[in-house]
Curated annotation (Swiss-Prot):
InterPro entries in the record: FMRFamid-related_peptide-like (IPR002544), FMRFamide-related_np (IPR051041)
Key words of the record: Amidation, Cleavage on pair of basic residues, Neuropeptide, Repeat, Secreted, Signal
PTM annotation (Tyrosine amide): residues: Y76
Protein name: FMRFamide-like neuropeptides 1
Organism the protein comes from: Caenorhabditis elegans
Propeptide: 22-68, 79-86, 157-165
């Protein structure tokens, strides 16, 4: 279960049971304490941030705060270096990678020292790349050029651009 769902479930359970004084003394058997004891220390601290240090806050209000961030909330990286995720020991904690050499490969960061590099996919027709053009840092490309009528490109491939020699599928945004 993801942390967000665990915390949401915990706060929902806490809304039905009012926990007072301390969060779950040893031997407590409430549903809240059962779920709370399954969380890691970091997750327990996050729950206490929402419902108070002694878990005496209003769990319904805390749950509404959680729901407010839930649909669009994303976290990249970790607060501490974790070496059990298959990363190299000296890797950046803000590095995030989904997949590995698959067609649906998604990577943020780590492209020859360019911190703003973002790549979706590999070099197939639905390839999408932001950044990493040799001459232009504002380069943006959708698709591949090789005889694809759906190719779409933002930016110039050469410096001597001539406005009069536009192709039929020319597309420009801005001046």
């Amino acid at each position: 279960m993801t942390l967000l769902y665990q915390v949401g479930l915990l706060l929902l359970v806490a809304a039905t049971y009012k926990v007072s004084a301390e969060c779950c003394t040893p031997g407590a058997t409430s549903d809240f304490c059962t779920v709370f004891s399954m969380l890691s220390t970091m997750e327990q601290n996050e729950v206490m941030n929402f419902i108070g240090e002694n878990c005496d806050g209003d769990a319904e209000v805390a749950l509404q705060k959680m729901e407010k961030r839930k649909p669009n909330f994303m976290r990249y990286g970790r607060s501490a270096a974790v070496k059990s995720l298959g990363k190299k020991a000296g890797s950046d904690p803000n590095f995030l990678r989904f997949g590995r050499s698959q067609p649906n490969f998604l990577r943020f960061g780590k492209a020859s020292g360019d911190p703003n590099f973002l790549r979706f996919g590999r070099s197939d027709p639905n390839f999408l790349r932001f950044g990493k053009a040799a001459a232009d840092p504002n380069f943006l490309r959708f698709g591949k050029r090789s005889a694809d009528p759906n190719f779409l490109r933002f930016g110039r491939s050469f410096d001597n651009f001539d406005r009069e020699s536009r192709k039929p599928n020319f597309l420009r945004f801005g001046k």
